C-alpha cells in the first residue's frame, strides 16, 4: 500500500522529561520518526518539553515546540498549526495519555485531527486492564486472575478473591508507578492508596501473584496488510515480581524450547490482531510457570517502548522508523532494511548470532531512605547493553559497563550473612550475590530454590566462579595462550583477572599483547551474517576473524556517557551526537563508543562507525588499537570518559581539544587555586583535607558553614553542607573515600548568594560566551537540581559583564579548546568563582535551544582545528525572551525520601519553559515538570527565621491572585506584623485540624517549606513534605522557588506557545 497522500502535516507528541520508567529511549524513537516522516515529504510538527533531546533540535522537525505536554497546551499548538494527524506512539505513556485527553476533551473532533500509529480504541483496549483481559479471553489466552476496581472497598473485596501475595497495578501509568506487591493487609491498603493517586483514571487491577514464574517479552510489529514479524524475543534473568525495566534481560530468549517459542510467537501475533495494532510496534509480556509450562499474558504496550529501543539496538532493526512509515500507510514488504544496505526487505525477520544482555543502573546512593528492594514499580535510572558470543561474555561486559566500579563479578559489598535475603528479595546487586552464594558453597539447587532464577543461568555463573577460583589459585605466568583465550572468551576483563592474580591490569595486558591475544570485532547485521552489511555497527569478542575493516581516513573517536546515572544524563548524549554530526560534515570519519541502548548516539547512522562497548580503559584501548584514530574526544560524555583521559594519554592516545593537563588544572584544587590567584579572581575560602584530623583543623581556619565533597565528582555525590565540627566529623566517618589521592574539599558556604552558570566555547584563540544563566534557587542547591533563567532575571548588567570578563580570563589561562562551564556565586555584588569544568556540561542543550547557538557542534569543530571565525561564531547571543530550565525529580518513586533540595543532585531530567517574561517562562517550566497549581485554595507557608523577610513578597503575590494564606504560627505572626491578613494553621504535633489534614482535604494549593539544618527541624517537618508529595500538591523547599512560582502564577491565564524556529529566527534578525 503506498503512503497516504491525504495527510500533509503530522504532529508528533514527545515523552517530555527523563523520569524513572521513561528515559532516553523516546528521544531515540522520536528522532527516528521525525527523520522518517520528513524523508517522505510530510511536514512534521513536534511538541516536547525536554530541551536536552536531539528530537527538539530545530533541524529535526519543520516546527518544534518546547512546551508542556498537556492537552490544553497541545490544543493551542493544534489551533495554530492545524496538523492533519497526530502520531502519539513515539512519546511513551505521556504521549498516549495526552492523545487520549485530546480525544476525550473533543479537541481531535473540533479540529478534525486523526490519530495515526494507534487508534483511540486500540490504546484504550491495551491500557485498560478490564478490556485487555476480556480481549485475551476472547482469543483463548489466559491472564492472571484479576479484578479491577475504583474504590478501596472494591479493592478489598477483590483482594479476598485473589489472595496474598497480591499484585496491585494502576491503569495508564508508566514504569509500574504507584503499584507493588502486598504480602499483608497493611501493605495492601498503602499500595492501593498510592496506586489510586497514580492512575489518571483512578483505577487499579488487583491481580493474582505469579511471583517466581519466568518472564518473557516479544517485540512485535504489524502493518495494515496483517504482515507481522517478531523483531526480538527477550528473556528476563529475574523471575516475575521484578519490573522488567529493572530486571536483567537477555536476547534472544535462552531457555525456551522451539515449540514453546513458536507458541509464544503465535500468541504475540494474536494479541496484536485482537487489540488492533496495525501500524507499528508493540511489546507483549508473558509469564511461564517453570514447573508446569503454563503460559499467561501479563500485558502489552501498543507503542514503541523501552524494550523497542533495546530490541532495535540488539538486532539493528529500526523499529521506530519502520513504525512511523507504517503509520502513514506503508506496508512491511514495501520497506527496505538500511543496515544491510537495503539488500533485504524489512519483512525479513531479524536473527542474531550473539547474546545481548541489558542491565539496569540504579541510584539508591542518592536516596538512602529509599527501599532498594526490586518490585513491580520501576526504580532504575538508566541501563547498559552488552553483546558477546557467549552469555558469560555478555554478562561480564554488561557488569563492567554499569559504571559502578565493577570489572566483572566483583565480590558484593554487603555482608556474607545477607546472601539468603539478597537472593530471596532481590536488590541492585543480586547478580553479584549469586556469585557470592557460589563462592560460599551454595548449590545451584539451593540458589534456585531461594531466588527462582532459572537453573541454566545459574549454571553459567557457577562456571564463572569456578574459573575465578582456578585463576586466583595460580599465578599470571601459569596462564598460557589457551587458558587466557578461554577466560577472555568468557568475558573476563584484564582488570578482573589482575584482581584475582594480585597483579596490575597493565601486567595482564602486557601478557596478552606479545602473543596477539586481542579481541576481534563482529558486525550487527540483523541476519546472523547471512547477508553482508554496509554499516559498521560492531561489538567485540575473542574469535579468529576480525570483521571491523577499518579505513585509512582521518578519524575522530567520541567516547559517550554510558548508562546515564543521575548527574550524567541525556544532556551528555546530546553533546556526543553533536560532536559526531558536524565532524562527519567536516570530512572526518567519526567513531562512537557507547553502551547505552536508549540513546541516539548508539543509533547505527549517527556516526560512521559504532562500537557498542563498555567505556573502560581496556575496551577503549582495544578500539584505538584497531582503528588508530587521529584524535579522541573525552570532553562530551561527562565524568565517565573524562576519568580515562590521563590513562589514555599515558598509552599514547591523542586527546584533542582541551588537554588532559588543563582538565587536571581545573579539577585539581591546588592547581586551580594558583590559576585564580594569578588572575586575581576570588574564590570562597577553601582548603583540602586528606583525613578527619586535618579536615577538622582546616575547617576552623575557614569557619562554618562549609560545603564538603570529594574531589573529581559529578552530580554532587557525597556533597553536604555542614554547620559544625560535629557534623563534619560525622561526614568524615561515613563511607566517603578520602585519601592522599582522593582528598576531601572544604569550601566556605556563601549564605543567600545567587548562583550563576556560564557556558562558553573557545578555539584556543578566541572565546565566545554561550549563555549566562541565573539560578532560581540560592547557592547551596546543586546546579543540576536548581531552576535557571537565560537571560538572568535580576542580575545587573555590571555584574554580568564582570562574569563575562572572568570567564574569558579563565578560558585563556587554561588553554581552552572546546567547551567550558563556570559556576559563580554573587554575594553583595561580589563575584566568587565556585568551579570550572573545561568540558561539556548538562546546561549545553538548554543554552543551545535558548540562543540558537549549537554550542556542542561549535566546540567539536574547534577541537578539530576549525576556528570560531571560520564557523561564523564571533559573539554572544542574548535572547529577547526568557527561557527557564527546571529539574524533574523521582521522589514519587521513593516513598519516605525527603524532598528537601541540597548540594547532592537527585533530579533525573529537565524541562524548559519559554515566555515573554520570566514569570511566564517559569510557570510553563513548572507545568512541564508536572506541577499543577489549583486556581483556588490556600498557600501554606512555613519557613525558617532567616527566610521570613523574603517570604513576604511571595505571600503578597499569591494573595493578590485570590489565594488564602495559611502559615504556621511563627510565620503567621511575622506576616501579620507586616500587614498581611493570614489564617494560621497547626503543625502536625500542635493538634488537629493540622496541615496534614488540610493537605488530605484538598484545601492546600501550594506549599513553601524551608527548614534549618537542625535534624530535629528537618524531622518535624518531614510529614508536611511527604503529605504534599502524596497529594500531588506543588511544593518548594526554598523561598526563591516559592517566590518564582508566585511571579509565574500571574501569567497563568496568558500563556502563549512559541516554536523554536520562530524564536531563533527573531534572534538572527536581531543579531
Curated annotation (Swiss-Prot):
Name the coenzymes or cofactors required: Mg(2+); Mn(2+)
The UniProt entry, under InterPro entries, shows:
ATP-grasp, CarbamoylP_synth_lsu, CarbamoylP_synth_lsu_oligo, CarbamoylP_synth_lsu_oligo_sf, CbamoylP_synth_lsu-like_ATP-bd, CbamoylP_synth_lsu_CPSase_dom, MGS-like_dom, MGS-like_dom_sf
Report residues binding ATP 1: 169, 175-176, 208, 210, 215, 241-243, 285, 299
Q: Which residues bind Mg(2+) 3?
A: 823, 835
Question: Entry cofactor note text?
Answer: Binds 4 Mg(2+) or Mn(2+) ions per subunit.
One Pfam family linked to the record: CPSase_L_D3
Q: What are the binding positions for Mn(2+) 1 in this chain?
A: 285, 299
Residues reported to bind Mn(2+) 4: 835, 837
Residues covered by region (Carboxyphosphate synthetic domain):
1-403
**What residues does Mn(2+) 3 bind to?**
823, 835
Which residues belong to any copy of the MGS-like domain?
A: 931-1071
Q: Which residues bind Mg(2+) 1?
A: 285, 299
Which SMART domains does the record cross-reference, listed alphabetically? Answer: CPSase_L_D3, MGS
Where do the record's region annotations for Allosteric domain lie? 931-1071
Listed under subunit, the entry gives: Composed of two chains; the small (or glutamine) chain promotes the hydrolysis of glutamine to ammonia, which is used by the large (or ammonia) chain to synthesize carbamoyl phosphate. Tetramer of heterodimers (alpha,beta)4.
The molecule here is called Carbamoyl phosphate synthase large chain
Q: Which organism is it from?
A: Neisseria gonorrhoeae
Identify the coding gene.
carB
Amino acid at each position: 500500500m503506498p503512503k497516504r497522500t491525504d495527510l500533509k502535516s503530522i504532529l508528533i507528541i514527545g515523552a517530555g522529561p527523563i523520569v524513572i520508567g521513561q528515559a532516553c529511549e523516546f528521544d531515540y524513537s522520536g528522532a527516528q520518526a521525525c527523520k522518517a516522516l520528513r524523508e517522505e515529504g510530510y511536514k512534521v510538527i513536534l511538541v516536547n518539553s525536554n530541551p536536552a533531546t536531539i528530537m527538539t533540535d530545530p533541524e529535526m522537525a519543520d516546527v518544534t515546540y518546547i512546551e508542556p505536554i498537556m492537552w490544553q497546551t497541545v490544543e493551542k499548538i493544534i489551533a495554530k498549526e492545524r496538523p492533519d494527524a497526530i502520531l502519539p506512539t513515539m512519546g511513551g505513556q505521556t504521549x498516549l495519555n495526552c492523545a487520549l485527553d485530546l480525544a476525550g476533551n473533543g479537541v481531535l473532533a473540533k479540529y478534525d485531527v486523526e490519530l495515526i500509529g494507534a487508534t483511540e480504541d486500540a490504546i484504550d483496549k491495551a491500557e485498560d486492564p478490564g478490556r485487555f483481559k476480556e480481549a485475551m479471553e476472547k482469543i483463548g489466552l489466559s491472564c492472571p486472575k484479576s479484578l479491577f476496581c475504583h474504590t478501596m472497598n472494591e479493592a478489598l473485596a477483590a483482594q479476598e478473591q485473589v489472595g496474598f501475595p497480591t499484585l496491585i497495578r494502576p491503569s495508564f501509568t508508566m514504569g509500574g508507578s504507584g503499584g507493588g506487591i502486598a504480602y499483608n493487609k497493611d501493605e495492601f491498603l498503602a499500595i492501593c492508596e498510592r496506586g489510586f493517586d497514580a492512575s489518571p483514571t483512578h483505577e487499579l487491577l488487583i491481580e493474582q501473584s505469579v511471583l517466581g514464574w519466568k518472564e518473557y517479552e516479544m517485540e512485535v510489529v504489524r502493518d495494515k496488510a496483517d504482515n507481522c514479524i517478531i523483531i526480538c524475543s527477550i528473556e528476563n534473568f529475574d523471575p516475575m515480581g521484578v519490573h522488567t525495566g529493572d530486571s536483567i534481560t537477555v536476547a534472544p530468549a535462552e531457555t525456551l524450547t522451539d515449540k514453546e517459542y513458536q507458541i509464544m510467537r503465535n500468541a504475540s501475533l494474536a494479541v496484536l490482531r485482537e487489540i488492533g495494532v496495525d501500524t507499528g510496534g508493540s511489546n507483549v509480556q508473558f509469564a511461564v510457570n517453570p514447573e508446569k509450562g503454563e503460559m499467561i499474558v501479563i500485558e502489552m504496550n501498543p507503542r514503541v517502548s523501552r524494550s523497542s529501543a533495546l530490541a532495535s539496538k540488539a538486532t539493528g532493526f529500526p523499529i521506530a522508523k519502520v513504525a512511523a512509515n507504517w503509520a502513514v500507510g506503508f506496508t512491511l514488504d514495501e520497506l527496505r532494511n538500511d543496515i544491510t544496505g537495503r539488500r533485504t526487505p524489512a519483512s525479513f525477520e531479524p536473527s542474531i548470532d550473539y547474546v545481548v544482555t541489558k542491565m539496569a543502573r540504579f541510584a539508591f546512593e542518592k536516596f538512602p531512605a529509599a527501599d532498594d528492594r526490586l518490585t513491580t514499580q520501576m526504580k532504575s535510572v538508566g541501563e547498559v547493553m552488552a553483546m558477546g558470543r557467549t552469555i558469560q561474555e555478555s554478562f561480564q561486559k554488561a557488569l563492567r559497563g554499569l559504571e559502578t566500579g565493577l570489572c566483572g563479578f566483583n565480590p558484593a559489598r554487603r555482608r556474607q550473612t545477607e546472601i539468603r535475603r539478597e537472593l530471596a528479595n532481590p536488590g541492585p546487586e543480586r547478580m553479584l550475590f549469586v556469585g557470592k552464594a557460589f563462592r560460599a558453597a551454595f548449590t545451584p539447587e539451593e540458589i534456585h530454590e531461594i531466588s527462582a532464577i532459572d537453573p541454566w543461568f545459574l549454571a553459567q555463573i557457577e562456571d564463572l566462579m569456578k574459573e575465578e577460583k582456578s585463576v586466583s589459585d595460580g599465578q599470571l605466568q601459569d596462564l598460557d595462550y589457551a587458558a587466557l583465550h578461554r577466560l577472555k572468551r568468557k568475558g573476563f576483563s584484564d582488570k578482573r583477572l589482575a584482581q584475582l592474580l594480585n597483579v596490575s591490569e597493565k601486567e595482564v595486558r602486557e601478557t596478552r599483547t606479545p602473543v596477539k591475544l586481542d579481541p576481534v570485532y563482529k558486525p550487527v547485521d540483523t541476519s546472523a551474517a547471512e547477508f553482508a552489511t554496509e554499516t559498521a555497527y560492531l561489538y567485540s569478542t575473542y574469535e579468529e576473524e576480525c570483521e571491523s575493516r577499518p579505513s585509512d581516513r582521518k578519524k575522530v573517536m567520541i567516547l559517550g556517557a554510558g548508562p546515564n546515572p543521575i548527574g550524567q544524563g541525556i544532556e551528555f548524549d546530546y553533546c556526543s551526537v553533536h560532536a559526531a554530526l558536524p565532524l562527519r560534515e567536516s570530512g572526518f570519519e567519526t567513531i562512537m563508543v557507547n553502551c547505552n541502548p536508549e540513546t541516539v548516539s548508539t543509533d547505527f547512522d549517527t556516526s560512521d562507525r559504532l562500537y557498542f562497548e563498555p567505556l573502560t580503559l581496556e575496551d577503549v584501548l582495544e578500539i584505538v588499537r584497531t582503528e588508530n584514530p587521529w584524535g579522541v574526544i573525552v570532553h562530551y560524555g561527562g565524568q565517565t570518559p573524562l576519568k580515562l583521559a590521563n590513562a589514555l594519554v599515558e598509552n599514547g592516545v591523542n586527546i584533542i581539544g582541551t588537554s588532559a593537563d588543563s582538565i587536571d588544572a581545573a579539577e585539581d584544587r591546588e592547581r586551580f587555586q594558583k590559576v585564580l590567584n594569578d588572575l586575581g579572581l576570588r574564590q570562597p575560602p577553601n582548603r583540602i583535607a586528606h583525613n578527619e584530623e586535618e579536615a577538622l583543623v582546616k575547617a576552623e581556619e575557614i569557619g562554618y558553614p562549609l560545603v564538603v565533597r570529594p574531589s573529581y565528582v559529578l552530580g554532587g555525590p557525597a556533597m553536604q553542607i555542614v554547620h559544625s565540627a560535629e557534623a563534619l566529623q560525622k561526614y568524615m566517618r561515613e563511607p566517603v573515600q578520602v585519601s592522599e589521592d582522593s582528598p576531601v574539599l572544604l569550601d566556605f558556604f556563601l549564605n543567600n548568594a545567587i548562583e550563576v552558570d556560564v557556558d562558553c566555547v573557545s578555539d584556543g584563540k578566541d572565546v565566545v560566551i554561550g549563555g549566562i544563566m541565573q539560578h532560581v534557587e540560592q547557592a547551596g542547591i546543586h546546579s543540576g537540581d536548581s531552576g535557571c533563567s537565560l537571560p538572568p532575571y535580576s542580575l545587573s548588567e555590571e555584574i554580568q559583564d564582570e562574569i563575562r570578563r572572568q570567564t574569558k580570563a579563565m578560558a585563556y589561562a587554561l588553554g581552552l579548546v572546546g567547551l567550558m562551564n563556570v559556576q559563580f556565586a554573587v554575594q553583595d555584588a561580589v563575584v566568587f568563582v565556585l568551579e570550572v569544568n573545561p568540558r561539556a556540561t548538562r546546561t549545553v542543550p538548554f543554552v543551545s535551544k535558548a540562543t540558537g547557538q549549537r554550542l556542542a557542534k561549535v566546540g567539536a569543530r574547534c577541537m578539530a582545528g576549525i576556528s570560531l571565525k571560520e564557523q561564523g561564531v564571533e559573539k554572544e547571543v542574548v535572547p529577547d525572551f526568557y527561557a527557564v530550565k527546571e529539574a524533574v525529580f523521582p521522589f514519587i518513586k521513593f516513598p519516605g525520601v525527603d524532598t528537601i533540595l541540597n548540594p547532592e543532585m537527585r533530579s533525573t531530567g529537565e524541562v524548559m519553559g519559554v515566555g515573554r517574561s520570566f514569570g511566564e517562562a517559569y510557570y510553563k517550566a513548572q507545568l512541564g515538570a508536572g506541577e499543577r497549581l489549583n486556581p483556588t485554595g490556600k498557600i501554606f507557608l512555613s519557613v525558617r527565621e532567616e527566610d521570613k523577610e523574603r517570604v513576604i513578597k511571595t505571600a503578597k503575590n499569591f494573595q493578590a491572585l485570590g489565594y488564602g494564606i495559611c502559615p504556621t504560627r511563627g510565620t503567621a505572626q511575622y506576616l501579620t506584623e507586616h500587614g498581611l491578613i493570614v489564617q494560621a494553621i497547626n503543625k502536625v504535633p500542635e493538634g488537629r485540624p493540622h496541615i496534614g489534614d488540610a493537605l488530605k482535604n484538598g484545601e492546600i494549593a501550594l506549599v513553601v517549606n524551608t527548614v534549618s539544618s537542625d535534624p530535629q527541624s528537618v524531622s518535624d517537618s518531614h510529614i508536611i513534605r511527604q503529605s504534599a508529595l502524596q497529594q500531588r500538591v506543588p511544593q518548594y523547599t526554598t523561598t526563591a522557588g516559592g517566590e518564582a512560582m508566585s511571579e509565574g502564577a500571574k501569567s497563568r491565564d496568558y500563556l502563549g506557545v512559541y516554536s523554536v524556529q520562530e524564536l531563533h529566527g527573531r534572534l538572527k534578525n536581531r543579531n
